[in-house]
Amino acid sequence: MVYWLMKFVFIGPLLKTLWPTKVVGAENIPETGGVILAGNHLAVADSFFMPLRVKRKVTFPAKSEYFTEPGLKGLLKKWFFTGVGQIPIDRSSGNAAQAALDTATRLVREGHLLGIYPEGTRSPDGRLYKGKTGVARIALESRGLVVPVAMVGTDKVNPIGSKMWWPRRLEIRFGTPLDFSRYDGLSGDRFIERSITDEIMYALMELSGQEYVDIYAAKAKELIAAEAAGVKAKVPEQPTGRAADRVPETKAG
């Protein structure tokens, strides 16, 4: 109930008014069944604008700290994050990453629409970075379809480090569903999982038009911070020639 109130009464109408959004390919999202929406990640705003344009409820995993803070502020945070479709993930255990994967897999198996960002964190410069293989593990273990989602322009609405949201026209592109059922039973094979992840990132690259960089976004942030501190470090440019073989251009299988 809270989710739909947030979407259609409290937040949704305002977002739709201030940020007109062109939506392409929404019909690619199955009307029923467990599905993974795998998106590029440009800004915090992604998790607001994308669910707003999807008919079904979208669930995102979120750190449990958002739901356990004491006092009135904590209650408001819990209400808000529950309302926008996020569920708590306990990251305090020794195997927090596995706990997150297990929760995400369970949600898809139960027929939910799961939102996930394979890059693992926001892009520091608007480029598309190497995907983490957790998305492949979830797809294999849940047997859910993967729909690539390209967010375009949210980094201009909500730039990293900015507390303001600026009026801009946005675009959200939903790609053709990817079916990895041909790999049933191969969860845990790191080569298969990497190949599947690369196929998803390739689809995102084509859908978004972003330049692809074959390192993790978290590493890119480290390099950018080092460069800002005066250390000679540089985020690699898009490879060409033989180096381009490292770009995820071969689809799994």
Where do the protein language model's features map onto the residues?
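Catalytic core of membrane glycerolipid acyltransferases/transacylases, capturing the structured
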Residues: 16, 29-94
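Non-catalytic C-terminal accessory region of glycerolipid acyltransferases
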Residues: 2, 98-253
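Short, basic, glycine/proline-bearing loop/turn elements
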Residues: 10-12, 83-91, 118-122
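Alpha-helical membrane-targeting segments
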Residues: 1-18, 70-85, 163-169
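Hydrophobic alpha-helical segments typical of transmembrane helices
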Residues: 9-10, 46, 76, 134, ...
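Short beta-strand-to-loop junctions in surface cap/lid or active-site-entrance loops
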Residues: 23-29
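Generic structural signal for residues in well-ordered beta-strands
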Residues: 21-23, 86, 172
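Short gly/ser/thr-rich secondary-structure transition/capping motifs
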Residues: 16-23, 96-98, 155-156
